[in-house]
Regions:
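Activation targets extended, charge/polar-rich intrinsically disordered C-terminal tails
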Residues: 123-202
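Loop/turn positions that initiate beta-strands
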Residues: 24-26
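Glycine-rich catalytic cores of cysteine/serine-nucleophile enzymes that process amide/ester linkages
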Residues: 30-97, 119-127
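A short, structured loop/turn motif at beta-sheet edges
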Residues: 61, 101-102, 143-144
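Boundary at the C-terminal end of the N-terminal hydrophobic targeting segment
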Residues: 16-19
Length: 202
């Protein structure tokens, strides 16, 4: 029984230590262990070849670490351990860190202003709703207040240029054509940005 207690205590200490290595404003990229039907070439991280489907923002509130993220429930604060467990069940997580951290505090403050907004499952910019990588793109600035991550032309197609059936069906439910080429953002684009260094895979 004593040995079991010591093992549990060590596991807890290791978990806390791992959290302490995460800095304010680090970006948490969730990746899938399988390539789903919604994954296109544009959502793959270049150096790891991992399909990235989500991004969140690490933020410390007191001595507790959270993932600030846009999910189905809207823009919410998720305890880091719950976020980590959720991503682990689907694949894993990459932790990204800005090379230049001079604008981190302002960036996180900007993101917190979106807390409570509804989720945008159509991935359109300039609406009151917001999706995961849009939260990062809108919020992250350098020390001069300039946005770090540009908008890109969104891609919903496979390597052969064919729009994936998943996205055709998804937008058809809303009476829309797939917005191929429209301005937007995605998690892999941010993970691949030269402003970011991937420091850890979990």
């Amino acid at each position: 029984m004593k040995h079991l207690y010591l093992i549990l205590l060590l596991a807890c200490a290791l978990g806390v230590n791992a959290q302490q290595q995460v800095l304010e404003g680090d970006l948490l990229f969730a990746y899938s262990s399988t390539t789903g039907r919604a994954i296109s070439d544009a959502t793959v991280h270049d150096s790891t070849a991992l399909p990235i489907y989500h991004v969140a923002i690490a933020t410390w509130i007191g001595d507790r670490l959270y993932a600030l993220e846009a999910i189905d429930e809207g823009v919410v604060l998720t305890p880091y351990d719950k976020f980590q467990e959720r991503t682990k069940n689907k694949g894993g997580m990459l932790i990204g860190r800005l090379h230049d951290r001079s604008g981190v505090d302002q960036s996180v403050s900007n993101a917190m202003e979106h807390l409570g907004k509804p989720y945008d499952d159509l991935y359109m910019i300039d609406t009151q709703e917001i999706y995961c990588s849009e939260l990062v793109q809108l919020s992250y600035v350098n020390g001069k207040g300039q946005r770090l991550f540009p908008l890109i032309n969104m891609s919903f197609h496979d390597a052969k240029g064919r729009i994936l059936d998943y996205w055709r069906e998804h937008y058809a439910k809303h009476g829309m054509a797939v917005p191929e080429g429209a301005l937007g953002t995605n998690p892999a684009q941010i993970a691949n940005d030269p402003a970011i260094e991937i420091i850890k895979q979990q």
